[in-house]
């Protein structure tokens, strides 16, 4: 039986969850990355983590990295990118994909105070052409060094904390965002 203090903490945390800020990992193959992204999702209050993989049984979270954060997330598995992004669009979310395309917006130029799914591609190939074609926004993290990109989990953390910063500045963490049916 949870203590009163534990119940209060859980209520406080749940009241800050952001049901309309969702994260999608497309074809991620390195368990460390999926684990680190799950931990970052939980830290910023993103409740839903979607994983696109034809082999969901191979997606294993490393508890040493997640610190059991996945326990507090709703994790959804999808066989295909079209399936996942169609479901999210059907829920009224806009799709923002990370890409190295020169036409992409800097990640700080995106308005994160809207229903949004952030899609991160796999470590080797990045985002698929399918995800690009289904996206509403294309974003990138500007760089001035010689490397083209950052590690997947680092990119996700940078972008999720920009979403957190914008939503916090607009008071989105000060009022409960989960509907009663999910909050209870």
Give the ranges of each region predicted by the language model:
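Post-transcriptional modification and biogenesis factors for structured RNAs
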Residues: 1-184
């Amino acid at each position: 039986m949870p203590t009163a203090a534990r119940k209060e903490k859980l209520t406080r945390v749940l009241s800050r969850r952001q049901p309309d800020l969702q994260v999608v990992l497309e074809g991620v193959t390195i368990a460390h990355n999926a684990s680190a992204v799950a931990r970052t999702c939980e830290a910023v209050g993103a409740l839903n983590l979607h994983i696109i993989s034809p082999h969901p049984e191979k997606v294993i979270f490393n508890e040493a990295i997640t610190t059991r954060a996945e326990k507090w997330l709703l994790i959804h598995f999808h066989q295909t990118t079209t399936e996942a992004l169609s479901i999210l669009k059907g829920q009224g979310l806009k799709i923002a994909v990370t890409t190295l395309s020169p036409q992409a917006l800097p990640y700080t130029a995106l308005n994160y105070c809207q229903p949004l799914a952030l899609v991160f591609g796999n470590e080797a190939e990045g985002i698929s052409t399918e995800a690009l074609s289904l996206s509403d926004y294309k974003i990138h993290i500007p760089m001035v060094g010689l490397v083209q990109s950052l590690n997947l989990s680092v990119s996700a953390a940078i972008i999720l904390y920009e979403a957190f910063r914008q939503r916090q500045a607009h008071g989105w963490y000060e009022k409960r965002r989960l509907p009663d049916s999910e909050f209870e």
